Amino acid sequence: MSYSAPSQITQRQLAYFEGKHVLIAGELNDNFPLELDKHCASTSIFTTNYGYYKQFSENPKINCYFGTELIEESHADMILLYWPKAKAEAEYLLTMLLAKLGKDTEIIVVGENRSGVKSVEKMFANFGPMNKLDSARRCSFYWGQCTETAPSFNLQDWFKEYQVQFKEHTIEVRSLPGVFSHGEFDKGSELLLQTLPSLRGHVLDFGCGAGVLGSVMKTINPKIHLDMVDISAFAIASSIETLKANGLEGNVFASDVYSDTKQNYQFIVSNPPFHAGLKTHYSSTEELLQKAPQNLTHSGQMIFVANSFLQYPPIVEKVFGHCNTLAKNNKFRIYSAQK
């Protein structure tokens, strides 16, 4: 079994976990919890990644929780935090989990050095001591303990509010840490919206993020039946809040690509992700494109934006027989294919 570099450095330090009830959170993307479970009293996972949740939710040995907050009761006395890409997300997870688990909770933090994991020393200062104990494979391993009473946690305090202007429309956006384009209007999404035709029927916004794309589409095309999906619990919560802030209606839910969609669509519209953590990641977008025809209605259309250097047209051509370029600039291209 091949583990990520942060998991490999953790594997060197299994003695720290002996007899502990460990709650794992953060940028975890391998099966290391199964290995860890052999060495500690119990293992549970809190994840904001729906795909990872589905991977472990059927495992009888490990309790796996998905969402923006740990709502369920937990007997964990140790947190293993895989440092996420966004510093604000790390701060969010630390604050939320320590508020839930309380004083005396031990915490181990692992992460790639280039991810900025070193900042945990300063970030954790108000909770208690935090010391670096190991480094290997360009990663660091920290141990700390919460010796102070953690402040109460309120999800609403973590939303960032900003406005997006598109033509004559002003969209109020509410976004949680770690959500794509947190605090700004993505230029790729803007070009996509400028290019879209009039929409009708059932429309899928794949990779909805903070809900900007879906909110603009619903504002301009109020009669559409809008589904908005994302793999991130932070994105789902953000999109729900953004729709609410603009008095709009849409069906927002977690889905690992098409895993939880229930119907075919007249339009699939997307600014698909290609970064997962610190690594460039294409697999979910490839699945989006490859399975699009079977998730579109007869004569349904897929329209998406991508960075110019990404080689998506051959994938689209293979499944649709064609791929049209509707618009482009020096950074992005808008592609379209019709069933």
Curated annotation (Swiss-Prot):
The similarity comment for this entry is: Belongs to the methyltransferase superfamily. RsmC family.
The UniProt entry, under CDD domains, shows:
AdoMet_MTases
Q: Which UniProt keywords apply?
A: Cytoplasm, Methyltransferase, rRNA processing, S-adenosyl-L-methionine, Transferase
Q: Which reaction does it catalyse?
A: guanosine(1207) in 16S rRNA + S-adenosyl-L-methionine = N(2)-methylguanosine(1207) in 16S rRNA + S-adenosyl-L-homocysteine + H(+)
Protein EC: 2.1.1.172
Function of the molecule: Specifically methylates the guanine in position 1207 of 16S rRNA in the 30S particle.
Q: Where can this protein be found?
A: Cytoplasm
Principal EC category = transferase
Q: What is this protein called?
A: Ribosomal RNA small subunit methyltransferase C
- Which gene name belongs to this protein? rsmC
Q: Does the keyword Nucleus apply?
A: no
